[in-house]
Amino acid sequence: IAKALGLAVLASGGIYAAQRGVVDTFVQTTDASIVDFLGAVALAVLAFKGFTTITNSGGEIENPRKNVGRAIVISIAICIFIYLLVAAAVGTNLSIQEIVAARDYALAEAAKPAFGQYGLWITVGFAIIATVSGVIASVFAVSRMLAMLTDMELVPHSHFGMPGNIQKHTLVYTIVLAMTLTIFFDLSRIASLGVIFYLLMDIAIHWGVLNYLRKEISANRFILLTAITLDLIVLIAFIVVKVKADSIVIWTSLAGLFLIITAEKLYLSRKRK
Protein backbone atom coordinates (compact mmCIF):
# COMPACT_ATOMS: atom_id res chain seq x y z
CA ILE A 1 0.00 0.00 0.00
CA ALA A 2 2.80 2.42 0.92
CA LYS A 3 4.57 1.63 -2.35
CA ALA A 4 1.48 2.25 -4.49
CA LEU A 5 0.56 5.45 -2.66
CA GLY A 6 4.13 6.75 -2.86
CA LEU A 7 4.34 6.19 -6.61
CA ALA A 8 0.91 7.76 -7.08
CA VAL A 9 1.95 10.88 -5.12
CA LEU A 10 5.20 11.29 -7.06
CA ALA A 11 3.50 10.71 -10.40
CA SER A 12 0.67 13.11 -9.55
CA GLY A 13 3.22 15.77 -8.61
CA GLY A 14 4.99 15.23 -11.92
CA ILE A 15 1.75 15.57 -13.88
CA TYR A 16 0.78 18.69 -11.89
CA ALA A 17 4.06 20.35 -12.88
CA ALA A 18 3.91 18.98 -16.43
CA GLN A 19 5.71 20.82 -19.18
CA ARG A 20 3.28 19.55 -21.85
CA GLY A 21 -0.16 17.96 -22.00
CA VAL A 22 -0.74 14.36 -20.95
CA VAL A 23 -2.60 13.63 -24.19
CA ASP A 24 0.35 14.91 -26.24
CA THR A 25 2.63 12.54 -24.34
CA PHE A 26 0.70 9.44 -25.36
CA VAL A 27 0.43 10.42 -29.03
CA GLN A 28 4.12 11.09 -29.61
CA THR A 29 5.64 9.13 -32.48
CA THR A 30 9.03 7.42 -32.50
CA ASP A 31 11.22 5.65 -35.03
CA ALA A 32 10.95 2.34 -33.15
CA SER A 33 10.00 -0.70 -35.23
CA ILE A 34 7.17 -3.08 -34.38
CA VAL A 35 9.76 -5.62 -33.22
CA ASP A 36 11.28 -3.09 -30.80
CA PHE A 37 7.80 -2.24 -29.54
CA LEU A 38 6.93 -5.89 -28.93
CA GLY A 39 10.29 -6.37 -27.20
CA ALA A 40 9.34 -3.55 -24.82
CA VAL A 41 5.97 -5.24 -24.27
CA ALA A 42 7.86 -8.33 -23.05
CA LEU A 43 9.47 -6.27 -20.28
CA ALA A 44 6.05 -4.77 -19.49
CA VAL A 45 4.69 -8.31 -19.05
CA LEU A 46 7.34 -8.89 -16.38
CA ALA A 47 6.06 -5.82 -14.55
CA PHE A 48 2.78 -7.67 -13.97
CA LYS A 49 4.43 -10.90 -12.82
CA GLY A 50 3.68 -10.08 -9.21
CA PHE A 51 0.12 -11.37 -9.41
CA THR A 52 1.50 -14.92 -9.63
CA THR A 53 2.41 -14.46 -5.97
CA ILE A 54 -1.35 -14.55 -5.33
CA THR A 55 -1.79 -17.88 -7.12
CA ASN A 56 1.22 -19.36 -5.33
CA SER A 57 -0.43 -18.40 -2.04
CA GLY A 58 -3.81 -19.82 -3.01
CA GLY A 59 -3.75 -22.40 -0.23
CA GLU A 60 -3.63 -19.62 2.36
CA ILE A 61 -6.47 -17.56 0.85
CA GLU A 62 -10.00 -17.92 2.19
CA ASN A 63 -12.41 -19.26 -0.45
CA PRO A 64 -9.64 -19.42 -3.11
CA ARG A 65 -11.95 -20.40 -6.01
CA LYS A 66 -13.63 -17.03 -5.72
CA ASN A 67 -11.04 -14.76 -4.16
CA VAL A 68 -7.89 -15.70 -6.13
CA GLY A 69 -9.39 -14.51 -9.41
CA ARG A 70 -10.83 -11.41 -7.76
CA ALA A 71 -7.47 -10.56 -6.14
CA ILE A 72 -5.65 -10.95 -9.48
CA VAL A 73 -8.09 -8.66 -11.32
CA ILE A 74 -7.88 -6.01 -8.59
CA SER A 75 -4.06 -6.14 -8.45
CA ILE A 76 -3.73 -5.86 -12.25
CA ALA A 77 -6.17 -2.91 -12.30
CA ILE A 78 -4.15 -1.10 -9.62
CA CYS A 79 -0.89 -1.81 -11.48
CA ILE A 80 -2.28 -0.48 -14.76
CA PHE A 81 -3.47 2.72 -13.07
CA ILE A 82 -0.13 3.31 -11.30
CA TYR A 83 1.96 2.49 -14.39
CA LEU A 84 -0.08 4.81 -16.62
CA LEU A 85 0.21 7.55 -14.01
CA VAL A 86 3.99 7.10 -13.84
CA ALA A 87 4.29 6.97 -17.65
CA ALA A 88 2.26 10.18 -17.96
CA ALA A 89 4.36 11.94 -15.30
CA VAL A 90 7.66 10.96 -16.90
CA GLY A 91 6.51 11.56 -20.47
CA THR A 92 5.10 15.01 -19.79
CA ASN A 93 8.31 16.28 -18.19
CA LEU A 94 11.19 14.46 -19.90
CA SER A 95 12.24 13.77 -23.46
CA ILE A 96 13.21 10.26 -24.58
CA GLN A 97 16.89 11.19 -24.30
CA GLU A 98 16.38 12.52 -20.76
CA ILE A 99 14.49 9.38 -19.74
CA VAL A 100 17.34 7.19 -21.03
CA ALA A 101 19.90 9.33 -19.22
CA ALA A 102 17.94 9.29 -15.94
CA ARG A 103 17.28 5.51 -16.15
CA ASP A 104 16.18 4.30 -12.69
CA TYR A 105 15.69 7.89 -11.49
CA ALA A 106 13.36 8.99 -14.31
CA LEU A 107 10.39 9.42 -11.98
CA ALA A 108 12.48 11.49 -9.56
CA GLU A 109 13.57 13.73 -12.44
CA ALA A 110 9.96 14.07 -13.59
CA ALA A 111 8.84 15.01 -10.07
CA LYS A 112 11.63 17.59 -9.58
CA PRO A 113 9.51 20.58 -10.68
CA ALA A 114 6.99 19.72 -7.95
CA PHE A 115 9.18 18.28 -5.19
CA GLY A 116 12.67 19.53 -6.02
CA GLN A 117 15.63 17.54 -4.68
CA TYR A 118 13.32 15.92 -2.13
CA GLY A 119 11.73 14.05 -5.02
CA LEU A 120 14.96 12.10 -5.48
CA TRP A 121 15.11 11.06 -1.83
CA ILE A 122 11.42 10.17 -1.80
CA THR A 123 11.93 8.05 -4.92
CA VAL A 124 14.93 6.28 -3.38
CA GLY A 125 12.94 5.62 -0.21
CA PHE A 126 9.99 4.12 -2.04
CA ALA A 127 12.33 2.20 -4.34
CA ILE A 128 13.86 0.55 -1.26
CA ILE A 129 10.39 -0.28 0.09
CA ALA A 130 9.28 -1.61 -3.29
CA THR A 131 12.41 -3.71 -3.76
CA VAL A 132 12.38 -5.20 -0.27
CA SER A 133 8.66 -5.99 -0.29
CA GLY A 134 8.80 -7.37 -3.83
CA VAL A 135 11.83 -9.56 -3.13
CA ILE A 136 10.37 -10.92 0.10
CA ALA A 137 7.02 -11.72 -1.54
CA SER A 138 8.64 -13.35 -4.59
CA VAL A 139 11.17 -15.36 -2.59
CA PHE A 140 8.54 -16.80 -0.27
CA ALA A 141 6.17 -17.53 -3.17
CA VAL A 142 8.89 -19.33 -5.16
CA SER A 143 10.12 -21.27 -2.13
CA ARG A 144 6.54 -22.35 -1.39
CA MET A 145 6.11 -23.56 -4.97
CA LEU A 146 9.44 -25.42 -4.91
CA ALA A 147 8.48 -27.06 -1.63
CA MET A 148 5.21 -28.24 -3.18
CA LEU A 149 7.04 -29.65 -6.23
CA THR A 150 9.49 -31.37 -3.89
CA ASP A 151 6.64 -32.98 -1.96
CA MET A 152 5.25 -34.19 -5.30
CA GLU A 153 8.71 -35.64 -6.08
CA LEU A 154 8.98 -33.60 -9.28
CA VAL A 155 12.25 -31.84 -8.38
CA PRO A 156 15.34 -33.13 -6.54
CA HIS A 157 16.03 -32.01 -3.01
CA SER A 158 18.85 -32.16 -0.48
CA HIS A 159 18.81 -30.55 2.96
CA PHE A 160 22.65 -30.24 3.07
CA GLY A 161 22.51 -30.72 6.83
CA MET A 162 20.16 -27.78 7.37
CA PRO A 163 17.47 -28.05 10.05
CA GLY A 164 13.82 -27.22 9.46
CA ASN A 165 11.21 -28.21 6.89
CA ILE A 166 11.52 -28.35 3.11
CA GLN A 167 10.18 -24.84 2.54
CA LYS A 168 12.93 -23.36 4.72
CA HIS A 169 15.48 -25.23 2.61
CA THR A 170 13.98 -24.04 -0.69
CA LEU A 171 13.91 -20.52 0.73
CA VAL A 172 17.68 -20.70 1.25
CA TYR A 173 18.23 -22.14 -2.24
CA THR A 174 16.14 -19.36 -3.81
CA ILE A 175 18.04 -16.61 -1.99
CA VAL A 176 21.43 -18.13 -2.91
CA LEU A 177 20.41 -18.34 -6.58
CA ALA A 178 19.18 -14.74 -6.54
CA MET A 179 22.44 -13.55 -4.96
CA THR A 180 24.44 -15.46 -7.57
CA LEU A 181 22.54 -13.73 -10.37
CA THR A 182 23.20 -10.29 -8.87
CA ILE A 183 26.93 -11.06 -8.73
CA PHE A 184 27.23 -11.94 -12.42
CA PHE A 185 24.53 -9.78 -14.04
CA ASP A 186 23.22 -6.23 -13.74
CA LEU A 187 19.54 -5.43 -13.17
CA SER A 188 18.80 -5.04 -16.88
CA ARG A 189 20.14 -8.50 -17.75
CA ILE A 190 18.43 -10.13 -14.78
CA ALA A 191 15.13 -8.61 -15.94
CA SER A 192 15.78 -9.85 -19.49
CA LEU A 193 16.50 -13.38 -18.25
CA GLY A 194 13.34 -13.18 -16.17
CA VAL A 195 11.29 -12.21 -19.22
CA ILE A 196 12.54 -15.18 -21.26
CA PHE A 197 12.06 -17.77 -18.52
CA TYR A 198 8.71 -16.34 -17.44
CA LEU A 199 7.23 -16.35 -20.95
CA LEU A 200 8.53 -19.88 -21.59
CA MET A 201 7.02 -21.02 -18.30
CA ASP A 202 3.73 -19.35 -19.19
CA ILE A 203 3.65 -21.08 -22.58
CA ALA A 204 4.46 -24.45 -21.00
CA ILE A 205 1.71 -24.10 -18.39
CA HIS A 206 -0.91 -23.09 -20.94
CA TRP A 207 0.15 -25.96 -23.21
CA GLY A 208 -0.09 -28.41 -20.32
CA VAL A 209 -3.56 -27.19 -19.35
CA LEU A 210 -4.68 -27.31 -22.99
CA ASN A 211 -3.55 -30.89 -23.52
CA TYR A 212 -4.03 -32.53 -20.12
CA LEU A 213 -6.32 -30.52 -17.83
CA ARG A 214 -8.67 -28.57 -20.11
CA LYS A 215 -11.70 -30.82 -19.64
CA GLU A 216 -11.04 -31.43 -15.97
CA ILE A 217 -11.04 -27.73 -15.06
CA SER A 218 -13.36 -26.56 -17.90
CA ALA A 219 -10.69 -24.27 -19.38
CA ASN A 220 -11.53 -22.26 -22.49
CA ARG A 221 -9.56 -23.62 -25.46
CA PHE A 222 -9.68 -20.30 -27.35
CA ILE A 223 -8.27 -18.34 -24.39
CA LEU A 224 -5.43 -20.84 -23.93
CA LEU A 225 -4.48 -20.78 -27.62
CA THR A 226 -4.67 -16.98 -27.69
CA ALA A 227 -2.41 -16.73 -24.63
CA ILE A 228 0.14 -19.13 -26.15
CA THR A 229 0.13 -17.21 -29.46
CA LEU A 230 0.58 -13.81 -27.81
CA ASP A 231 3.34 -15.16 -25.56
CA LEU A 232 5.18 -16.57 -28.59
CA ILE A 233 4.88 -13.32 -30.56
CA VAL A 234 6.23 -11.23 -27.68
CA LEU A 235 8.96 -13.76 -26.82
CA ILE A 236 10.22 -14.01 -30.41
CA ALA A 237 10.30 -10.22 -30.74
CA PHE A 238 12.20 -9.89 -27.45
CA ILE A 239 14.73 -12.53 -28.52
CA VAL A 240 15.28 -10.73 -31.85
CA VAL A 241 15.92 -7.46 -30.01
CA LYS A 242 18.31 -9.09 -27.54
CA VAL A 243 20.23 -10.98 -30.25
CA LYS A 244 21.11 -7.61 -31.75
CA ALA A 245 21.60 -5.67 -28.50
CA ASP A 246 22.82 -8.14 -25.86
CA SER A 247 23.39 -11.72 -27.05
CA ILE A 248 24.83 -12.76 -23.66
CA VAL A 249 21.26 -12.84 -22.33
CA ILE A 250 20.24 -15.31 -25.05
CA TRP A 251 23.22 -17.62 -24.55
CA THR A 252 22.75 -17.56 -20.78
CA SER A 253 19.06 -18.40 -21.19
CA LEU A 254 19.86 -21.30 -23.51
CA ALA A 255 22.46 -22.64 -21.08
CA GLY A 256 20.02 -22.34 -18.19
CA LEU A 257 17.27 -24.11 -20.12
CA PHE A 258 19.63 -26.91 -21.12
CA LEU A 259 20.76 -27.45 -17.52
CA ILE A 260 17.22 -27.39 -16.13
CA ILE A 261 15.74 -29.72 -18.76
CA THR A 262 18.68 -32.16 -18.59
CA ALA A 263 18.70 -32.29 -14.79
CA GLU A 264 14.92 -32.73 -14.63
CA LYS A 265 14.94 -35.53 -17.22
CA LEU A 266 17.69 -37.38 -15.40
CA TYR A 267 15.91 -37.00 -12.06
CA LEU A 268 12.52 -38.16 -13.35
CA SER A 269 14.01 -41.09 -15.27
CA ARG A 270 15.76 -42.30 -12.10
CA LYS A 271 12.56 -41.88 -10.08
CA ARG A 272 10.66 -44.12 -12.54
CA LYS A 273 13.29 -46.84 -12.12
PLM feature segments, named:
Residues F48, T55-E60, G119-H157, T182, ...:
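Membrane-helix boundary/coupling elements in multi-pass transport proteins
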Residues V73-I136, L154-L187:
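TM-loop-TM module centered on a large, flexible mid-protein loop between adjacent transmembrane helices
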